Amino acid sequence: MKRVILTGLATVGILALSAFTSVTGKVTSKKSHLTFFSHTDVEDISADNYKAVSTLDASTGAVVFSVPMQSFEFDKSLMQKHFNSPKFLDTKQFPKAKFKGNIIDLTKVHFDKDGTYQTTVEGDMTLHGETKNIKEKISVIVKGDEVNVKSKFNLTLADYKIAFENGKPATNIAKTVEVSIDVFY
């Protein structure tokens, strides 16, 4: 009986401590889901990527993403082939998209307190060999020792020298695509 009580108290103690754990320092993503969506009158195109890796420094707000471009998954294999081809993203020459930036107002995010925090991230996005400064809204959801970052924003393909002058892709792919990010640290 004494052993059961001690085991119960130890379990309650461990659970209580874990409930008050906060995120500090640099953390690496545990899982990620990125999507892009293109809408035109001709068709909708979407793809998923579960292979992105990210780090977040809770003390400085620094954020880094690395996205392997060949890991985007499409419903149709032909779309995947076109996506990776030299005529579109040329993923052999440009295998990764990268983002390196910072949470602008880190005082809005309390990594030591459960909650959902709205803020902005700003930094350099490199895609298809082109680097542009972007500034986007993000949601930071803190729950115990886990942080979830979500964002949805638009990327204009021409900003990264991705363009179709003629042919079927010119009418099938939107000039601006919607990107969604859902990352757990």
Show which residues each predicted segment covers.
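Low-complexity, acidic/polar, glycine-enriched regions of mature
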Residues: F20-Y185
